[in-house]
């Protein structure tokens, strides 16, 4: 069980994927999902457990899936997609015994994901087919998909690619990711009316045709050490432009991910680590 209603104790597992860290809760015993206030409290690094996102293990929603999971950002808002979280949920289900075999399916709020166990603590997750049409992102004010968009933001023009990986992403290509204005430009794009659902903003540096460096300013969280869907989005935008090959290493501040996109109508596959940190109880 995840929670003990009489004592108010909440059992959890702390995990991370390339430094993107999570509190994992098993809600399959009927424990209700956290509301926004509780999610923010759990995620608080000073007064709670501390994490980028809360992941809730739930009953499967699609036929043949091992389980489903919910996603809550550190500000308490709900999310629809989290690539690093998908790998951690997969590893949690394997340790729990729920997921059997080398391949299985898990349901995110956005879609069903095929998962494959790799060597050690690594998992591969099929993240879906990138969607570039503005209505699917959503991106307002543009009728058709483009390789690059431009928006006036506080007296400057920001150029970016845009894609949905089940959640909205803007990708800004930069010469040096270490010097990128991640927080300033990330926050400005998130607040721009062109993104009615806000947006995750990635800053990508092409090192060579098979290597990208990336930092991501996530909606509802801020900059994180890694963002799996952001790595997929950056790779897809750069691949579509012909800037990189269809199989790349993406280096984030917290670690390395491998992103493969075999063809335009095929799913992006993300590979990377899923690490257990500790199990605990939170007294609420």
Curated annotation (Swiss-Prot):
GO cellular component, one term: cytosol
A molecular function GO annotation: diaminopimelate epimerase activity
Pathways per UniProt: Amino-acid biosynthesis; L-lysine biosynthesis via DAP pathway; DL-2,6-diaminopimelate from LL-2,6-diaminopimelate: step 1/1
Residues with site note (Important for dimerization): 278
Record keywords: Amino-acid biosynthesis, Cytoplasm, Isomerase, Lysine biosynthesis
One of the protein's GO biological processes: lysine biosynthetic process via diaminopimelate
Record-listed substrate binding positions: 20, 53, 73, 83-84, 167, 200, 218-219, 228-229
Active site: 82 (proton donor), 227 (proton acceptor)
EC number: 5.1.1.7
Catalysis: reaction(s): (2S,6S)-2,6-diaminopimelate = meso-2,6-diaminopimelate
Keyword Cytoplasm: yes
PANTHER family in the cross-refs: DIAMINOPIMELATE EPIMERASE, DIAMINOPIMELATE EPIMERASE, CHLOROPLASTIC
Protein task: Catalyzes the stereoinversion of LL-2,6-diaminopimelate (L,L-DAP) to meso-diaminopimelate (meso-DAP), a precursor of L-lysine and an essential component of the bacterial peptidoglycan.
Subunit field text: Homodimer.
Name recorded for this polypeptide: Diaminopimelate epimerase
Species whose genome carries this gene: Xanthomonas axonopodis pv. citri (strain 306)
Taxonomic placement: Bacteria, Pseudomonadati, Pseudomonadota, Gammaproteobacteria, Lysobacterales
């Amino acid at each position: 069980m995840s929670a003990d209603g009489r004592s108010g104790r909440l059992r959890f597992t702390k995990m991370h994927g390339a430094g993107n860290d999570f509190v994992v809760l098993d809600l399959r015993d009927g424990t209700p999902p956290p509301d926004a206030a509780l999610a923010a409290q759990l995620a608080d690094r000073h007064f709670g457990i501390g994490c980028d996102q809360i992941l809730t293990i739930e009953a499967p929603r699609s036929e043949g899936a091992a389980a489903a999971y919910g996603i809550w950002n550190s500000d308490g808002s709900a999310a629809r997609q989290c690539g690093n979280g998908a790998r951690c949920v997969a590893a949690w289900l394997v340790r729990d015994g729920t997921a059997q075999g080398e391949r299985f399916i898990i349901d995110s709020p956005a879609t069903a994901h095929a998962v494959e166990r790799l060597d050690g603590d690594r998992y591969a997750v099929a993240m879906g087919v990138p969607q570039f049409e503005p209505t699917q992102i959503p991106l307002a004010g543009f009728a058709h998909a483009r390789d690059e968009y431009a928006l006036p933001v506080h007296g400057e023009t920001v150029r970016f690619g845009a894609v949905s990986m089940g959640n909205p992403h803007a990708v800004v290509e930069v010469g040096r990711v270490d010097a990128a204005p991640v927080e300033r430009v990330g926050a400005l794009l998130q607040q721009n009316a062109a993104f009615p659902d806000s947006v995750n903003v990635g800053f990508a540096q092409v090192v060579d045709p098979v290597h990208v460096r990336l930092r991501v300013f996530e909606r509802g969280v801020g900059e994180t050490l890694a963002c799996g869907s952001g790595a997929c989005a950056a790779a897809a935008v750069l691949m579509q432009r012909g800037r990189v090959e269809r199989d790349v290493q993406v280096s984030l501040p917290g670690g390395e991910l491998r992103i493969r996109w075999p063809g335009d109508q095929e799913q992006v596959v993300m590979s990377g680590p899923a690490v257990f940190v500790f199990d605990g109880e939170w007294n609420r």
